[in-house]
Swiss-Prot record:
PROSITE patterns: PROTEIN_KINASE_ATP, PROTEIN_KINASE_DOM, PROTEIN_KINASE_ST. It catalyses: L-seryl-[protein] + ATP = O-phospho-L-seryl-[protein] + ADP + H(+); L-threonyl-[protein] + ATP = O-phospho-L-threonyl-[protein] + ADP + H(+). This is LRR receptor kinase BAK1. The active site is at D428. Pfam families: LRR_1, LRRNT_2, PK_Tyr_Ser-Thr. Belongs to the protein kinase superfamily. Ser/Thr protein kinase family. ATP binds at L307, G308, R309, G310, G311, F312, G313, K314, V315, K329. The gene is BAK1.
Amino acid sequence: MAAPRWAVWAVLLLRLLVPAARVLANMEGDALHSLRTNLVDPNNVLQSWDPTLVNPCTWFHVTCNNDNSVIRVDLGNAALSGTLVPQLGQLKNLQYLELYSNNISGTIPSELGNLTNLVSLDLYLNNFTGPIPDSLGNLLKLRFLRLNNNSLSGSIPKSLTAITALQVLDLSNNNLSGEVPSTGSFSLFTPISFANNPSLCGPGTTKPCPGAPPFSPPPPYNPPTPVQSPGSSSSTGAIAGGVAAGAALLFAIPAIGFAWYRRRKPQEHFFDVPAEEDPEVHLGQLKRFSLRELQVATDTFSNKNILGRGGFGKVYKGRLADGSLVAVKRLKEERTPGGELQFQTEVEMISMAVHRNLLRLRGFCMTPTERLLVYPYMANGSVASRLRERPPSEPPLDWRTRRRIALGSARGLSYLHDHCDPKIIHRDVKAANILLDEDFEAVVGDFGLAKLMDYKDTHVTTAVRGTIGHIAPEYLSTGKSSEKTDVFGYGIMLLELITGQRAFDLARLANDDDVMLLDWVKGLLKEKRLEMLVDPDLQSNYIDVEVESLIQVALLCTQGSPTERPKMAEVVRMLEGDGLAERWEEWQKIEVVRQEVELGPHRNSEWIVDSTDNLHAVELSGPR
């Protein structure tokens, strides 16, 4: 019996498609092999890229779709050097090209503009030179473009403004010149995206272009006037103070008992669970570690390797098979149905938050009983450990480093709030969560471990996450967090940097001082005892005006009403010297008017009116 006509056509179509697929695979394989021959690979990362294998989908660091077409190339942080090749433009279905943190040099091929399905182009932390290709403006699906920390020159192509899908742009730390485009998608980006390009000018930077009119000053800050009954602010302050003090005692007493109990508690035992990996789980460029690999790295999660403990679990120091040091965070969470999917989602979101001042997630591990995150090891520890737990043989953090930490951590938090989609609220900003890399640059850690923010401005959680002394009053009383929750915690962290003190310290009771650092600082300001504020470890080696500015920023960040606190992007600008004086003066006027409306003296009126601007240098550098 003759075969049905449709079957004949199906066979013919299959015969046509199979050779076409082979041709595509050959073309993509040839393109990737050309890249390999142009790169120096000291660690044999590209060893599996065998040109005799027709299909590149079997190669490591290459991901294909169901049609055996290359959609992802992941070669980040692989110690590669050499140059890119124009043949990369033949990978027509490529969505992710990850070549960050290598030593690749030369120019960026204009043929990359042919990759019209590209979603992410990450070439940062390399040695690229020459211009940014104008052809990149053809990548209309591009969401992430990070070319920072190279040596790129020339102007920024205006064609990039047509990429309406662009969400993350980082061109900082290059040698770019000319005017920064301000139309299209570029209207969304702040000067952080273009920082440290001395020859750039225009609205996207802090300096006008030659011949252009000077920038208009920003409008004065006019916070919304809350509608409330007379005296409600005072009563609210009293209630907030009572809640904070009560919470302090509530946490302190059980903490003492728990510490005593832990001394008696037998050592916990770790049960070895076979590493079960789901081959279907792919989370971008993140490496999925086996549980056994991390057990070996941490000596079976030995107590001697514990770097710290926190609300999310313990952190262990580990050494991988390649000799690199890592910090392994072993999460403690209750296993619930659907928890695996939630974990994958949160890990993916964390991995997409890439910034100089954010701790980069290196990989993860997921088994039926374990959730682990792997980060680079920070040899210089945290700001908290450097302020209060450093060995006598090590010098204290100098004032210049503290200033750099303040600015770097502010930039990292601003990135989480303004450049992540959905935005990420940290919810536990404190000195212990600001880590220090080998150059003592601030690196914000532990972000994204709490529930991620959605597109709304606030998020109500079932449990308050945070540390006493750092928790904003509205978060403590309502469980309602927002960006301004992080701003409050950041302000407390600034006071830690200035004073060297803990945010919550029962030891201060011995001197009849406040246990809360914020209250202690306000008390000293009220009594005009500013000489007691600055960390004695600095030994007068600081700049008075900068100390005054940092105190002002800290107090603006820790205002009782979240609506009156600045956003982190504004904090960055104030730390860079833009707008602090105006904001401080405006805030003082508002406080004076508020006192008059309430027909009663504000409990902090003396230190509000006597701003640190009116203090003489001798008052900050006197005897301690």
